[in-house]
């Protein structure tokens, strides 16, 4: 019993002290892995992906990805500085890569390494659509969502170990715990946790694209195209790490006017044409 208490105390101490501050909410978040470890690992993975992929350079699409990325990064810098987060991006090493692939995918690694796959460009449809995707993915990195997911996974593993230690003398209870813990912790904890990241990335991503001069109204149109591309098959929202397409579209439509108001604070009163 004494050992069990020690395990739980160590978990509590880890959660309390291993924290970082989300620059968009000001709230403390779990950070068992620091940027000094996370960024080099992300950069190495990025270089590996590039070495194993067909990277497109010198085309109008590749130039667009870089152009939009630079504008979103500049918007993020302006927004962060205006909200008191000076120097937050000092360790970022922005890079923008277009990869030839049918995958409908794009991502931004911790530290600012961004990849777009050609398969997502028809759904983006235009430069403003690319900006909507870019803003969303950049926020995942800036808000430390990857770091939080890794930390939550470590905590989940720690709780599983603690549960096994606590129930080691009761085979029946231990069996029930191991059968149910993964499902319960995912549905009640990890999945809503991931959905909250998606919602935050949508909200702040709209602001960044608006500050960069792109019309945030296009984000909802992008997700209508994404919904059409995904067809009728969809996972129930409570079992998904992402909000449903309909929920996301409604949220984006509601938040777009607020993003425009935020952009006005940075002198943005009109947006680039959508074409």
Regions inferred by a protein language model and the residue ranges of each:
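A Zn2+-metalloprotease active-site environment signal
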Residues: 2-8, 17-275
């Amino acid at each position: 019993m004494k050992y069990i208490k020690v395990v739980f105390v160590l978990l509590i101490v880890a959660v309390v002290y291993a924290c970082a501050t989300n620059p968009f909410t000001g709230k403390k978040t779990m950070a068992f892995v620091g940027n000094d470890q996370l960024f080099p690992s992300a950069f190495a993975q990025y270089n590996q992906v590039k070495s194993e992929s067909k990277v497109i350079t010198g085309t109008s699409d590749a130039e667009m990805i870089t152009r939009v990325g630079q504008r979103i990064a500049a918007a993020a810098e302006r927004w962060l500085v205006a909200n008191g987060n000076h120097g937050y991006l000092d360790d970022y090493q922005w890079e923008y890569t277009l990869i030839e692939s049918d995958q409908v995918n794009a991502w931004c690694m911790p530290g600012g390494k961004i990849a777009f796959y050609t398969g997502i460009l028809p759904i983006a449809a235009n430069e403003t659509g690319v900006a909507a995707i870019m803003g969303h993915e950049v926020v995942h990195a800036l808000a430390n969502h990857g770091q939080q997911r890794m930390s939550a996974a470590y905590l989940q593993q720690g709780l599983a170990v603690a549960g096994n230690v606590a129930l080691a003398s009761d085979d029946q209870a231990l069996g029930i715990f191991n059968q149910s813990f993964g499902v319960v912790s995912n549905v009640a904890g990890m999945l809503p946790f991931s959905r909250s990241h998606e919602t935050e990335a949508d909200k702040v991503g709209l602001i960044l694209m608006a500050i960069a001069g792109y019309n945030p109204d296009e984000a909802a149109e992008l997700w209508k195209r994404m919904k059409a591309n995904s067809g009728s098959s969809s996972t129930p929202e409570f079992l998904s790490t992402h909000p449903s397409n309909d929920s996301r579209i409604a949220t984006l439509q509601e938040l777009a006017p607020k993003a425009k108001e935020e952009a006005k604070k940075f002198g943005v009163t009109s947006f680039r044409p959508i074409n």
